[in-house]
Structure formats: structure tokens, C-alpha cells
A protein has these predicted regions:
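ATP-dependent adenylation/nucleotidyltransferase module used to activate substrates
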Residues: 1-125
């Protein structure tokens, strides 16, 4: 299949789609990992939300073992947009594949009775 130029760059197309989403849905949520892609998406969505005076749900699923700098960045984003987000910081026990041990193929983040790597923030669900 041949390429068909659309006459629009990726950034402008993304902004149009975000605006369309705000036009067509009463509630908007963004899943946020703290990585570069979801950070760019969050900034773009929040630009539109602030322009329209709307709040956005921001979901972060905390797997307990993320790097401190990632957790710090996520908190900074929640703080930056505090007036415009409904924060959903989820820190619940979730069974995960354990790629660092052949003896324990599963690891449960935030497991009951386990010593946690760090404490979840007070706002965590």
C-alpha cells in the first residue's frame, strides 16, 4: 500500500484528535506511566483541558518497584496540574511476572504482609 500524505504533521493531528475527544466526551482520562510518551500525551491533553476549563482523570498504576526518579516525575506532574486533574494513583496488590528470579516466577507488588520497597503516597488508592 502506498503512502498517502495527509497534509498534516503528527503533532497537529494529535491536537485535533485531543480536541475532538473533548468535544465528544464529558469525562476524559489519561493513563500515565511517567515515561516520555505518556508525559508528552499528558502535557498535550492538559493544554486542551486548561484551555476549556475542564478536569482530566489521570491514572497511574504504581507497581512499587519503579525508579525513584520516575516516581518523583509522576508526583511533579500531579503537582503541576493539581487544579486540573482528578488523580488516581493506584497502589494495590497486583501479581506480576518476576523476570529476575527462576525460583519465584511471580512477585506481588504492595503484597499484604510483605516488606515494601517504599511507602505509597497518602493519595494512593
Amino acid at each position: 500500500m502506498a503512502k498517502r500524505p495527509l497534509g498534516i504533521n503528527v503533532y497537529d493531528a494529535a491536537r485535533e484528535r485531543i480536541a475532538w475527544t473533548f468535544d465528544n466526551f464529558p469525562r476524559i482520562s489519561v493513563s500515565f506511566s511517567g515515561g516520555k510518551d505518556s508525559t508528552v500525551m499528558l502535557h498535550m491533553v492538559m493544554d486542551e483541558a486548561i484551555k476549556r476549563g475542564r478536569k482530566v482523570g489521570v491514572l497511574f498504576v504504581d507497581l512499587e518497584g519503579q525508579y525513584k526518579l520516575t516516581i518523583d516525575h509522576i508526583q511533579e506532574m500531579y503537582d503541576l496540574y493539581a487544579e486540573h486533574v482528578e488523580p488516581y494513583w493506584v497502589a494495590l496488590p497486583i501479581a506480576l511476572r518476576n523476570a529476575v528470579s527462576q525460583y519465584e516466577p511471580k512477585w506481588t507488588c504492595w503484597g499484604d504482609g510483605a516488606d515494601w520497597i517504599r511507602q505509597p503516597p497518602p493519595m494512593a488508592i
